[in-house]
């Protein structure tokens, strides 16, 4: 289902087929092709790989679960309700079983994943 971004978009994660990506199972809710200002993904994280984005900033909102996130040389705690801003260039990965909503600015993040492990 695709809707023109100049009007509005509505997507239900339950209606989007997931696929495996660097962080886990991703469901794109607002995609690059939607031509919105950002991309939004619903992600089930499990065994994420350390990576960075050269051109994309990410905002993670933790919906469910708990764990940690490695950001360059730091590690922070994660649990439901926490928001994390990850600027482009920062090496990062989430550790634990988490359900997150990621907002990626600008769009095009799936072409900007640089895995380090």
Report each predicted region and the residues it spans.
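A cytosolic small-molecule/anion-sensing beta-strand core signal
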Residues: 63-64, 79-80, 96
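Short, conserved beta-strand element in jelly-roll/cupin
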Residues: 43-46, 54-70
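Ligand-binding loop in jelly-roll beta-barrel domains
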Residues: 88-113
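Structural motif
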Residues: 59, 66-68, 75, 91, ...
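A short glycine-rich, His/Asp/Glu-containing loop-to-beta-strand
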Residues: 14-50, 103, 113-116
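Short glycine/proline-enriched turns and hinge-like loops at secondary-structure junctions
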Residues: 53-55, 96-97
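Short acidic-glycine-tyrosine-enriched beta hairpin
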Residues: 73-89
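Extreme N-terminal tail/first-helix region
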Residues: 2-20
């Amino acid at each position: 289902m695709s809707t023109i971004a100049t009007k509005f978009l509505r997507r239900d994660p339950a209606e989007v087929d997931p696929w495996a990506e660097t962080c886990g199972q991703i469901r794109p809710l607002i995609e690059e092709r939607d031509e919105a200002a950002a991309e939004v993904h619903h992600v089930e994280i499990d065994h994420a790989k350390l990576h960075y984005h050269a051109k994309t900033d990410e905002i993670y909102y933790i919906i469910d679960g708990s764990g940690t996130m490695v950001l360059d040389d730091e590690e922070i705690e994660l649990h439901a309700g926490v928001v994390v801003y990850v600027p482009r260039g920062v090496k990062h990965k989430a550790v634990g079983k988490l359900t997150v909503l990621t907002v990626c600015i600008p769009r095009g993040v799936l072409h900007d994943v640089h895995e380090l492990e």
